[in-house]
Amino acid sequence: MSKTFFVTGTDTDAGKTTCTLALLQAAAAKGLKAVAYKPVAAGCEMIENKPCNQDVLLLQKHSALPLQYEQVVAYSFDAFSSPHIAAEESGVTIKLDVLSEGLSRLKKSTGADIIFVEGAGGWRVPIGNGHFLSDWVKYENMPVIMVVGARLGCINHSVLTYEAIHHDMLPLVGWCMNRITPSMNHYQQNLETLKSLLPAPFMGEIPYINKPDEQDLGKYLDISTLL
């Protein structure tokens, strides 16, 4: 049976996709069949006359098994905005059971050892009709991996995100630090503070890298606590 983990971030552009690629590569290095799923993606570009989300394409490319675009994502919207706004503009209602059906089909069709489910935005991103994406994560009872985007304010964002996950009675099974800029004042002090405040395994640091999707990212994360 597939192990499933939800990857959330401390904010939009914290580096969820970069971290998910690293997780996929780290799992592959251990001989595991790992694939990715993104329940909701907002922001598409025309590629070969088809609207596609770049994050979904990267997850599709780096999954250990061949997947169709539609297997990786349940809802893909054109607008670069919060999912609930993108859905409303498209005249679509995001349904939790559709998210679950997509995940279930992926499990059955691939027989993957691990599925990394990448969220959208932060933990409390709304998806419409009074629901948050975190409501679905809670319904699926998924363990959570948190990506901390290294920027001023990340300590507050990280602690608040952890508290929200804990409030939802879900386990934070690991977290990583992702450097989203070449330099950050007091980076090491921020990292050490987070290590002392977050009661979850520290999985590693992903350095600032140009074109991270073309690099070996798996070496930066220790996934032993997930296995």
Curated annotation (Swiss-Prot):
Family: Belongs to the dethiobiotin synthetase family.
GO cellular component: cytosol
Catalytic activity: (7R,8S)-7,8-diammoniononanoate + CO2 + ATP = (4R,5S)-dethiobiotin + ADP + phosphate + 3 H(+)
Amino-acid positions noted as binding Mg(2+) in the UniProt annotation, renumbered to this chain: T17, D55, E118
Gene Ontology biological process: biotin biosynthetic process
Database matches in Pfam families: AAA_26
Assembly and interaction partners: Homodimer.
Single Gene Ontology MF annotation: ATP binding
Residues at which ATP binds: 13-18, 55, 118-121, 178-179, 207-209, 214
General function of this protein: Catalyzes a mechanistically unusual reaction, the ATP-dependent insertion of CO2 between the N7 and N8 nitrogen atoms of 7,8-diaminopelargonic acid (DAPA, also called 7,8-diammoniononanoate) to form a ureido ring.
Protein name: ATP-dependent dethiobiotin synthetase BioD
